[in-house]
């Protein structure tokens, strides 16, 4: 089993005032660094899906993949699947840049839940489809899905009968969409310190 990883960092950050979330800091460190340090050890190769100037990620030493046709997170997933397939990977594990507490066992738990097929994370009764495992075999179906104007991650996951991998810590998938979410994450860091 060859698992590759992808940090989804292509969003516009509208609820953060148009700020590039990858450039936001938590505990004095970039969000993209948090996710890279948590997801990287779980996968054979790691890349970032982002549009705009790739030089802003130069310090991480990771490949930056651009969306062919920006249509939200699934466009990034498609770019990642094509990159992973070209390198001989079996599947791609994704995590958004704004989930800095992503679990250190995300990839293996997703793999086990889906038995190598599509799987998404679930915690506290909520599904987190952007934290998912996508076999490279679904790439062309995803391309067709996007070409048909579909863009919902959960819709594509459901189309492939994605299994759900349960995680006990709700905060593991805390999504930093707004300034108050970032403040909550800072508070959690202080509690854990």
Swiss-Prot record:
Residues of the signal peptide: none
Keywords: Cytoplasm, GTP-binding, Magnesium, Metal-binding, Molybdenum cofactor biosynthesis, Nucleotide-binding, Transferase
GO molecular function list: GTP binding; metal ion binding; molybdenum cofactor guanylyltransferase activity
Superkingdom of the source species: Bacteria
CDD domains per UniProt: MobA
GO biological process: bis(molybdopterin guanine dinucleotide)molybdenum biosynthetic process
Enzyme Commission number(s): 2.7.7.77
Pfam family, one: NTP_transf_3
Enzyme class: transferase
This protein's record includes keyword Transferase: yes
Listed transmembrane segments: none
GO annotations of cellular component type: cytoplasm
Binding locations of GTP: 8-10, 21, 67, 98
Cofactor(s) listed: Mg(2+)
NCBIfam families referenced in this protein's UniProt entry, alphabetically: molyb_mobA (TIGR02665)
Cross-referenced HAMAP family: MobA
Assembly, per entry: Monomer.
Record family assignment: Belongs to the MobA family.
Chain's role: Transfers a GMP moiety from GTP to Mo-molybdopterin (Mo-MPT) cofactor (Moco or molybdenum cofactor) to form Mo-molybdopterin guanine dinucleotide (Mo-MGD) cofactor.
Protein name stated in the entry: Molybdenum cofactor guanylyltransferase
Originating organism: Cereibacter sphaeroides (strain ATCC 17029 / ATH 2.4.9)
């Amino acid at each position: 089993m060859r698992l590759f990883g992808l940090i989804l960092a292509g969003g516009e950050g509208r609820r953060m005032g148009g700020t590039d979330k990858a450039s936001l800091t938590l505990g004095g460190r970039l969000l993209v660094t948090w996710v890279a340090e948590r997801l990287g050890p779980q996968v054979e190769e790691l890349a970032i899906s982002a549009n705009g100037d790739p030089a802003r990620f130069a310090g991480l030493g990771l490949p930056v993949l651009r969306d062919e046709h920006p249509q939200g997170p699934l466009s990034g997933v498609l770019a990642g699947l094509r990159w992973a397939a070209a390198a001989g990977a079996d599947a791609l594990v994704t995590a958004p840049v704004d989930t800095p507490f992503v679990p250190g066992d995300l990839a293996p738990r997703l793999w086990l839940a889906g038995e190598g097929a599509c799987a998404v994370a679930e915690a506290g009764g909520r599904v987190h489809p952007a934290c998912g495992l996508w076999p490279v075999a679904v790439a062309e179906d995803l391309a067709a899905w996007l070409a048909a104007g579909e863009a919902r991650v959960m819709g594509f996951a459901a189309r492939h009968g994605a299994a759900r991998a349960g995680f006990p810590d709700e905060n593991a998938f805390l999504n930093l969409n707004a300034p108050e979410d970032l403040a909550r994450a800072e508070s959690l860091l202080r509690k854990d310190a």
